[in-house]
Amino acid sequence: MGFNIGDKLVYPNHGVGVVETIGESLYDGRAHPCYQVRLLANNSRVVVPVGNSDRVGLRPLTRRQDVTGVFRVLEDGAFQSNGDWKGRFKQNLDKMRSGRLSDIADVLKNLNWVQKQKTLSFREKKMYERARYLIVSEIAQVSGTTEAEVELDVEKALDRSVARRRSLGPNAR
């Protein structure tokens, strides 16, 4: 997938960025075409070789019509998780690394359910906050609304998920 200057994209686990320049950088003794991306979260800049963009997981923003599917994941009430926190953490980390917004929504929903049952570990709490930020910031960019508005929509979806989950009973998966 190729990007142009000014394109917004997603850098997995870091969030939305903008391609500021496309130039060449020297490494391994050769010049390689590279994207210089400014991450909107903290204004930091990363340089990604064009040839590595797929491997790194750079992707365009989620399409506007796919946002509905993300909210469906958030509110569906289904819960899949490894029983112990280490297994759950690894499972969720793999989903976070995929960079797909639907996978990140699944992580957020699952961790939201777990935190309703017990206190999250420090690492899971950080992952929960990161997943929430990544979802809110990307959907705000795609939909042209504020992060505060998206935050409210995400909270409502998570509340519906918990209500659905509770209606299924304690042994439902």
Language-model features and meaning:
Residues 25-36:
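Short, solvent-exposed secondary-structure boundary/capping segments
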Residues 17-19:
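Conserved hydrophobic positions within beta-strands
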Residues 36-51:
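A short macromolecule-binding patch
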Residues 51, 56-173:
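Charge/polar-rich, low-complexity and marginally structured segments
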Residues 6-7:
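Loop/turn positions that initiate beta-strands
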